Amino acid sequence: MSDWKNNPRDKSLLRQTWSDDFEQLYTLGSDIYLYIFNQVPACKGLFPWISKYEAEGRNFAEGAEFRAQALRFVQTISHVVKNVYHMERLEGFLYDIGQRHVQYASRGFKPEHWDVFQDAMQAALSNRMNTHPELSMDDRQRAIVIWRDIALYIILHMKEGYNDGLKGINRFPVRVIM
């Protein structure tokens, strides 16, 4: 990981390249999930409503369930951005999300899916940087590096929570609510 956590300019660039606009958030979340489903179609099985849509010949990406899931994912990213000046608050929050994903192992969630989620975040966030014409080329490239590190940070702590959860370990037994 780069040194963005200790660099005020990088933190400012991170916030500058983030938007809480509903449509932008939905588009980002959709891009993340569509990337995941294209890379690992079996991940669709984690969401029972997808097979229902597909059996009916409907596009699951147009359904309310997909929209809600896409927004749920980007809310986590948004929470990280809002707390970028207080990173110590985030570890338990992300770890807890990983712990909760243990319940999806019965639906086919596998530890290697975390890597696909990380790749999807990195790809979608990198593509999003191209929608910022106000950034210099250097700032755009730096933002891509910072967002890559954010994706790594998020997944690293979620994966740790998930792996510990599989072993019955919880380093943060009091649920972190932020």
Regions found by a protein language model. Give the residues of each.
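Globin-like tetrapyrrole-binding proteins
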Residues: 1-178
